Amino acid sequence: MPPKKTETKAADASAAAAPAPAAAPTSAPKTKSPSTHASYLDMITDAIVALKDRAGSSRQALKKYVRANNTLGNVTDNMFDSLFNKALKNGVDKGVFEQPKGPSGGTKLAKKVAKPAPKKAAPKKETKEKKPAAAKKEGAAKKETKEKKAPAAKKAAAPKKAAAPKKEVKEKKAAAPKKKAAAPAVADKETVLTKTKSGRVAKSTAKPAAAKKAAAPKKAAASKKAEKAEPAAEKA
């Protein structure tokens, strides 16, 4: 029995040393061959332009043109019909194609409606340029007001020239008393005491020098009368 155990161990070791079976080779990814034709939408558009049917080209006529003028490769009839119908429907939905009589009628290109040109907004730079112009106008107005104020100040200063004659008037008024003082002073009239016949003393104002000269003889006569009157008084 013990020899059997050794045999089993040797068999296990040989099995472990044996190389593992090689994995199956993976298949290379399938690459799609590039299409040698345009999209179905473009091919249908070219067919409509080439056929030039005013009422619209039929579906069968379009299919024949697409097959005859494009290399579609290994495409089955069923695949071609599904791709063609799908492209035609998408073109109608997008507004590229037009079917006036419905899906069973002819197909033609939709008329392009000219879109109105968007209105251009007024440039904002013009408003920015106008503001400095307004500021300049305000500055010019301020300068004009300043210039106007300056002549007003000059006009206010003008009365100073008119004030000069007042000094001359004052000087003339002050000079007026001098003229009065320069006038010859009136001499006080001299009073002369004379005695009347009754013996009373009478006061009389003296006349000017010329008058005094004329009155001189009268004084002599008066003195004679006084001398005569004194002896008479002594006798009495």
From Swiss-Prot:
It is found in: Nucleus; Chromosome. GO terms for cellular component: nucleosome; nucleus. Residues 1-36, 94-236 are annotated as: Disordered. Residues 11-36, 153-162, 202-220 have a biased composition (Low complexity). Residues 36-111 form the H15 domain. GO terms for biological process: chromosome condensation; negative regulation of DNA recombination; nucleosome assembly. Residues 1-10, 123-150, 165-174, 224-236 have a biased composition (Basic and acidic residues). InterPro entries: H1/H5 (IPR005819), Histone_H1/H5_H15 (IPR005818), WH-like_DNA-bd_sf (IPR036388), WH_DNA-bd_sf (IPR036390). GO terms for molecular function: double-stranded DNA binding; nucleosomal DNA binding; structural constituent of chromatin. CDD domains: H15 (cd00073). Could act as an H1-type linker histone. Belongs to the histone H1/H5 family. This is Histone H1. It comes from Neurospora crassa (strain ATCC 24698 / 74-OR23-1A / CBS 708.71 / DSM 1257 / FGSC 987).
